[in-house]
Design a protein with these regions (language model features):
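N-terminal, intrinsically disordered, polar/charged segments of Gram-positive cell-envelope systems
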Residues: 2-7, 32-81, 106
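N-terminal Sec-pathway targeting helices
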Residues: 5-23
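Alpha-helical transmembrane segments
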Residues: 24-31
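Short phosphate-engaging motifs
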Residues: 38, 92, 242-246
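A composition/secondary-structure signal for short, hydrophobic, low-basic-content segments
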Residues: 52-54, 134, 234
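Active-site beta->alpha N-cap acidic-glycine motif
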Residues: 57-148, 152-166
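Catalytic domains of cell-wall/extracellular-matrix polysaccharide-remodeling enzymes
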Residues: 142-255, 259-266, 274-279
């Protein structure tokens, strides 16, 4: 009888120990799962955060293109050609943009204020910026007497730059003087005014003379080929029908010669004015 009672006590003790073990194991496992669950971020949050970082990094890359290597004179290292177009916008601007897009080439436009005021042209001005082109100013009137004799160069350029800003949202500082900076900007006083206004000036290294070669695109091509002699060239052209015809062949020529196509970047500005004023 005593032995039977001892067995019962032993069985009860064993069951109690087993029950306690089960409770402890269950509790431990539950806390383990909770801890593990909390340590894993929600999938949507993790992916959203990761995507946001990636997007920000991509946008930063777009906003801050890598700085080009420069020569002592400030020009880029290597063979680089800048195609530039004056006197727009016009009814041909869209067609010029079509050719440039097809050829994967970015360029620099110098636009005239009186043309920028034409609302029919403004969509292509916006398009030019969206497609990676730079738009600088070419005065309001293109009138040499007003610009250089009557002291309206800086006021007209400021007005044109403001128009570009209103249309595109960009804030350009580069201008091209109608007929070039020589002799128009010969006087130091006018150049001081330009510097005070924070304006930069670009002339050109190659004059295609396209404006006077109506119906003769082949001669424009020959002019460009013949006068291309340096590693860094800035080609002056205009929004003319004959230039539009010549453009694909000009692009082909530079590609075959191993040139990269540059678009003006204020961070990489280099002096290019006939007055050789380093401030401009």
């Amino acid at each position: 009888m005593k032995e039977s009672q001892n067995k019962k006590k032993t069985n009860v003790g064993t069951k109690a120990i087993l029950s306690l073990g089960v409770v402890l194991a269950t509790t431990f496992f539950t806390f383990f799962l909770i801890g593990k669950w909390n340590s894993i971020p929600a999938k949507g949050v993790a992916n959203g955060s990761s995507n946001q970082v990636n997007t920000q990094q991509q946008e930063k890359k777009k906003e801050t293109p890598p700085a080009k290597q420069k020569r002592p004179d400030g020009k880029p290292v290597g063979k680089v050609v800048y195609l530039t177009f004056d006197d727009g916008p016009s009814e041909l601007t869209g067609k010029f943009l079509d050719v440039l897009k097809e050829q994967h080439v970015a360029s620099t436009f110098f636009m005239q204020g009186s043309n920028l005021q034409n609302t029919a042209f403004q969509e292509n001005v916006k398009r030019a910026v969206k497609e990676g082109h730079y738009i600088g100013a070419h005065s309001m009137t293109h009138n040499s007497d007003k610009l250089y004799k009557k002291g309206q160069f800086v006021p007209e350029m400021k007005e044109t730059l403001a128009l570009i800003h209103n249309i595109t949202g960009t804030t350009p500082k580069l201008v091209r003087p109608p007929y070039g900076s020589a002799p128009g900007l010969k006087g130091e006083e006018i150049r001081n005014q330009i510097v005070e206004a924070g304006i930069k000036v670009w002339d050109w290294t190659i004059d295609s003379n396209d404006w006077k070669l109506k119906g003769n695109p082949q001669q424009i091509i020959e002019n460009v080929k013949r006068t291309t002699t340096e590693d860094v060239e800035v080609v002056l052209m205009h929004e003319k029908p004959q230039t539009l015809q010549a453009l694909p062949e000009i692009i082909k020529f530079y590609k075959e010669k191993g040139y990269e196509f540059g678009v003006y970047n204020e961070a990489d500005h280099f002096q290019l004015n006939f007055q050789k004023d380093q401030r401009l």
